[in-house]
Amino acid sequence: MDLNAILIILGVIALIILVAHGIWSNRREKSQYFENSKNFTREARIREPQENQQYQTADQSQSDFQRNLLETDNDCFSSESAHNSHQPLYHYSEQSAVQSVDQIKIRLPDSEPNYVMQEQFSPKHTDYASMSIEELEKSIDLDEGINSSSQHLRQELAQISGQSIADDKVNIEEHIFTESSISFVEPQTNTEFQQVVEKTKSGNSSFIMLYVVASENQGFSGLQLTKTLDELGFIFGKKQIYHRHVDLSITSPVLFSVANIEQPGTFDLTNIADFYTVGIALFMQLPSYGNVTANLRMMIRAAKTIAQDLDGVVVTEQQEIFDEQAERDYLARVS
């Protein structure tokens, strides 16, 4: 017989043996599984009444024990018998009672419970009005900068300021804005102010002035006016008027200032909510710090911005509308 045929026959026989062995093993495992399942069910059914009886016995023993504790001395023998017959259960009840006693917490009437107080965050209130400039610079946030709109800060900075504007004698005249023309009423008691105005009108003055007046039968609200001045970088300072410094530091040189054209020419910040004025005056003393032409351009832009925000009109020293030609004339005076 050929060798290949022999090998094929042996392989088929081995395969049949493996298949038969697998079928036999599977049947044996199934039979064991069903047998265990039947045994488990049978044992459970047998055990169930035993457990119920045990639980009933335990409950009955516990009730008997409690009843025996309440009996008189005449029943001591029966109590001792019940105690001896149910000693494990009594031991369990005693342990439960000890644990219950340990869990009891006694609190005296006058004692207060101990609470764990959580530390609460309380923001620190810093009185910036009572701080000096050096302390402000150390405590201020570099990203935030100095809040120049704070009234207390402005008052303190104004007290420290050593700068002077004009001749410390400048007061601004009142004005009446009529339908046909704009006229200014000069205060009679301020002779020094009259001299400054006359010199300004004659062209012999060392001041350059611009006026921003309200429309007819209207006025500038104090809150709106101060808000606009703060946004433009003005700082309330000496003589109770606003000044535009080189920077936000009040110790820096003054470029130009803003005053009230109504007597006495100051701004009452304490009653700023009730403050109204018909106009303001922007003035710059010559020569000014730095580039005079650049400073004058800055003052002109500030006047136009104030007039735009407050719905006012920019007027020259000669009480004329400030137009492009007037602006060129102003710039020619300092060039």
Curated annotation (Swiss-Prot):
Q: Where does the sequence pass through the membrane?
A: 5-25
One of the protein's GO biological processes: FtsZ-dependent cytokinesis
Q: What is its subcellular localisation?
A: Cell inner membrane
The annotated topology with respect to the bilayer is: Single-pass type I membrane protein
Record has Cytoplasm as a keyword: no
Q: Which residues lie on this side of the membrane: Periplasmic?
A: 1-4
Is-annotated flag, keyword Transmembrane?
Answer: yes
List keywords of the entry alphabetically: Cell cycle, Cell division, Cell inner membrane, Cell membrane, Membrane, Transmembrane, Transmembrane helix
Pfam families named among the record's database cross-references = ZipA_C (PF04354)
Determine the domain of life of the protein's source. Answer: Bacteria
Subunit comment for this entry? Interacts with FtsZ via their C-terminal domains.
Role description: Essential cell division protein that stabilizes the FtsZ protofilaments by cross-linking them and that serves as a cytoplasmic membrane anchor for the Z ring. Also required for the recruitment to the septal ring of downstream cell division proteins.
Report the family membership.
Belongs to the ZipA family.
- Please state what the protein is called: Cell division protein ZipA
> Which source organism does the UniProt entry give?
Histophilus somni (strain 2336)
Q: Which gene encodes it?
A: zipA
